[in-house]
């Protein structure tokens, strides 16, 4: 099938990355359609909606490069699959990653299904990742060429069938080249700042936002030996390894969050960046998704990331039970956070990932939840 007979539907956010993605595909001769996904009502307290501005940018870019465009509303799907999950995780005292769930349930499920109804052969997004296609039909996901921008961490839940329908045109180039192309083509988004943070919070204060949906209950802040240090504003506002926002004065090393007791509503803190309570030796993770087959029965060595832009850590992975894996670290790792993703790699190939449930010391002692 020639490029002109291949329809690619591009998820366009109104940012420079998806704009250049659409431009590249159009230049390569594909039949390109731009889709703006409205996942959240971004209207602020003054009645201003950032989604309107973003969609106007999508319209401008699509008109510039000469492709049709549509807006599709996925607010219900986003609420049901992403935001409800986000709140449920915080209720459990965990720190979720809504971007991972958004990619799994919205951008590469609801959006992909919609695109296929439009006759799409592929969907494309402005993610910094790569897809390697093999002659037998199976695919692999690779890190983006720009190590500083690689987004495979957030794509770890994508399946073989999803990836077989996906294109990442800017995964082979660096961010500065994306900007250069946008400026060279005088695209409307060429100078637009990259968006940061969680889309449904935007520029708002995180505590204020979360308190609108979940009641906060203040409680005691204690050391692991039981000494009362202060008062916390609500366990959901804190994450393992957090230093800022604790409100603890005094001399000596800074204080860090080292654990939570949900039953008694206690936040545990200790002094020192390298306090032993912040380190663990292995984790158990569920919601497992592997792009390709791996040998969980015998276990295998690979590297892992436990948060975005973290250096790879050498690990050994094996089955814990039919619903979970055990990831054992070659050396203790600091501040691994339940609710976040553990993402596994073999060189540049992203093998897949899972959601961190519990974190342990070598002795089998549970870390972080006392």
UniProtKB/Swiss-Prot annotation:
ATP binds at residues 11-18, 37, 126. One of its GO terms (molecular function) is tRNA binding. The active site is at 102 (nucleophile), 199 (cysteine persulfide intermediate). Residues 97-99 are annotated as: Interaction with target base in tRNA. Keywords: ATP-binding, Cytoplasm, Disulfide bond, Nucleotide-binding, RNA-binding, Transferase, tRNA processing, tRNA-binding. It holds the Pfam family tRNA_Me_trans. The keyword NAD does not apply. Its main location: cytoplasm. The record marks 127, 340 as: Interaction with tRNA. Its EC number is 2.8.1.13. It is an enzyme of class 2 (transferase). HAMAP family: tRNA_thiouridyl_MnmA. Belongs to the MnmA/TRMU family. This is tRNA-specific 2-thiouridylase MnmA.
